[in-house]
């Protein structure tokens, strides 16, 4: 018809008067391609966008779920066709060969394993993605097919067209790897359930989620592994996907326990006109040794076995960053002596010092107070003001002198600058409140001492 990309609309309409035209909207096109990328997760967890009109799917280890590569390819293209998305697809050992076959080969082409060279040999040179300059020059040299280019000496090809052309050849043939940017982290631990009829009832969603988790957990158990994060994705008829994520404090593969964690989160799934596919992914997969069952039924379970289910429920309800444990850290500076760790992390090498009581609540940064000292130089204040409220000191213990750790890198130079000596006091006011306050600096120096509050005792 004489139409080509980049042609003016007026010229195109002159050639084809009944041509249907629409305004070009790159942002909308990109959003649609990203939505299609998310939709393809039902076929593979590893999906990458290719340019403006293509997708790569790494189907390693997933084609058996459809009964083979051919059935998977037909299902993919037919589903897209039902949604009005015409597509060409192909399968090969390498991304480059699959790209060439999908765009220039026969429809629904599948290159047998290890035979990508023969599969693409008869395709035009444009199938190699060599770039516009090389694609324009090769036909002038009488090179029209991929096989002709493959027959050239590598040195001659690199000299005339650059190393990028040789790299594209190697990527297509599998001699060089091709890095793909997947939309979500690729995971080989993937399984799926498809339904003859869409489902939407809450009890059905809970049941299929449990079934999908049972599938992936059975695979993990068969290979002696467990995982810390799981994701169940509900795929609607209209292409939208609703992921439900759960995490474990310890690696595990108990499908029933995971199903109990998923069930409260199913309220966020909007089934719409129905869910047609459920996929399940496992992340942070590690070896997991089988546990020896105890012969004495009354034996007390370990702390991990007792706490792990509770911690899992709290983490999945409140958020991963809201459930943690405070552990001691080897440091004299109070704000450096406590670190946040996972609730079931191994015990630390450092230990709490019972001879040095520390407040139940330690402030991240000390707060300034206005203090009136009773006696100098080593007595606590008899009155101090904090956050606009006055506190009269009734009892006090101290001082406990702490110096900055000059040997550590990154000592803050803020309100308690390096080299400053701190004298800490445990004080109680006339209402029973107990505070941890300190004096920064010494009397008689260049700068007047300052008073701070650093924590609260129970």
From Swiss-Prot:
Keyword Cytoplasm: no
UniProt KW Glycoprotein keyword: no
Key words of the record: DNA damage, DNA repair
Any one Gene Ontology BP term: DNA repair
Induction: Up-regulated in response to DNA damage in a RecA-dependent manner.
Function: Along with DnaE2 and ImuA is required for the error-prone processing of DNA lesions.
Protein's UniProt name: Protein ImuB
Native organism: Caulobacter vibrioides (strain NA1000 / CB15N)
Annotated gene: imuB
